[in-house]
């Protein structure tokens, strides 16, 4: 049938960076040169067509989108890590750990967010525990307040400062403090001398 003859005119012309016909420093294949197509079977039946060649340019929405090797160097940290440590009190919904991936697994009364953030589900104490040979988990246990020893240093110190505040307040209001006065016993003759 009809044979197709393709002639590429000027497609590879001027492959060097400095083209003699253009003062631009880009190669001709980056410019919009035209490709000539000849379609037809006979000698005089070919219909020459010219189609523009598209430029081979890379277009990005932003200048940082092109993938420069210098991008992302001075970016701030993500504030990851432990936020509430072991034996500290956590309220419901308080973030215990922010992490990438599951470095620490959730234990009792601890939930995990979609970004692997661990948070407390109840009010209680945070405890870090081993979970298998090489894993860790964090749990929150209900907080029971232990009764304090009244003779401990902390309790005596608290009581001492409470008494000091009361004395200072009484002095400021002008209330006379009751003081013990030692009275001397009067030796009177009516007292029984047999004693």
Swiss-Prot record:
The record, for HAMAP family, names: Ribosomal_bL27
Q: Assembly and interactions?
A: Part of the 50S ribosomal subunit.
* Alphabetized SUPFAM superfamilies for the sequence: Ribosomal L27 protein-like
Q: Does the keyword Ribosomal protein apply?
A: yes
Q: Which GO terms describe its molecular function?
A: structural constituent of ribosome
Specify the protein name: Large ribosomal subunit protein bL27c
**Gene assigned in the entry:** RPL27
Keywords from the named record: Chloroplast, Plastid, Ribonucleoprotein, Ribosomal protein, Transit peptide
List where in the cell it is found.
Plastid, Chloroplast
Any one Gene Ontology BP term:
translation
| InterPro entries, per database record | Ribosomal_bL27 (IPR001684), Ribosomal_bL27_CS (IPR018261)
**NCBIfam families assigned:** L27
**Could you point out where the transit peptide sits in the sequence?**
1-60
PROSITE patterns reported in the protein's UniProt record: RIBOSOMAL_L27
Q: Does the keyword Signal apply?
A: no
Give the source's domain of life in one word: Eukaryota
Major place of residence:
plastid
Q: What is the source species?
A: Oryza sativa subsp. japonica (Rice)
In the UniProt record, which is one GO cellular component term?
ribonucleoprotein complex
Which family does the entry's similarity section mention? Belongs to the bacterial ribosomal protein bL27 family.
Q: Which Pfam families match?
A: Ribosomal_L27
